[in-house]
């Protein structure tokens, strides 16, 4: 008898992808055999990076994280999440929770997704304590205002962010923002 491959989808805008997102990806690979990181086009959110740039950022980081033997792929999508999950053959949607406020929203989404297709479960993973306060929105705000974003994103993502902010609003000539990983 063959064993069915467990496929999960971890959806998000990932604008930018943070260390908290990568923590969820690593931990999700403990419960699925194949994880699809679904990068939502989500133009309504007015993303800083294009969909292609966000997909590339996620792909660039995958070699640097442990996936516990599971395979991970990255795909963009612009359909209903449940349609994307079914199209990918997923049995589970992975969602990260940082706080009670996340739970309220995610609880409603899980209920709606269950109504759309009760065959696909939603699995919540609590954010690790060191990542509970990280959000893409906060990282962008900190970076735009010249704060140190190194504790929240990889060095490669930090470099992309700082480059984008410099294009939007050039920093004063005497401003130096370190790009090395935080100790």
From Swiss-Prot:
Subcellular location: Cytoplasm
Pfam families cross-referenced by the UniProt entry: CTP_transf_like (PF01467)
InterPro entries named in the record: Cyt_trans-like (IPR004821), PPAT (IPR001980), Rossmann-like_a/b/a_fold (IPR014729)
Binding-site positions, substrate: 13, 45, 81, 95
Pathway(s): Cofactor biosynthesis; coenzyme A biosynthesis; CoA from (R)-pantothenate: step 4/5
GO cellular component: cytoplasm
EC number, as in UniProt: 2.7.7.3
Key words of the record: ATP-binding, Coenzyme A biosynthesis, Cytoplasm, Magnesium, Nucleotide-binding, Nucleotidyltransferase, Transferase
Catalytic activity: (R)-4'-phosphopantetheine + ATP + H(+) = 3'-dephospho-CoA + diphosphate
GO molecular function: ATP binding; pantetheine-phosphate adenylyltransferase activity
Listed SUPFAM superfamilies: Nucleotidylyl transferase
Cofactor: Mg(2+)
Recorded superkingdom: Bacteria
Site for Transition state stabilizer, residues: 21
Residues binding ATP, per UniProt: 13-14, 21, 96-98, 106, 131-137
Keyword set includes Nucleotidyltransferase: yes
Family statement: Belongs to the bacterial CoaD family.
HAMAP family: PPAT_bact (MF_00151)
Chain's role: Reversibly transfers an adenylyl group from ATP to 4'-phosphopantetheine, yielding dephospho-CoA (dPCoA) and pyrophosphate.
Subunit structure: Homohexamer.
Protein name: Phosphopantetheine adenylyltransferase
Gene source species: Rhodospirillum centenum (strain ATCC 51521 / SW)
Origin organism lineage: Bacteria, Pseudomonadati, Pseudomonadota, Alphaproteobacteria, Rhodospirillales
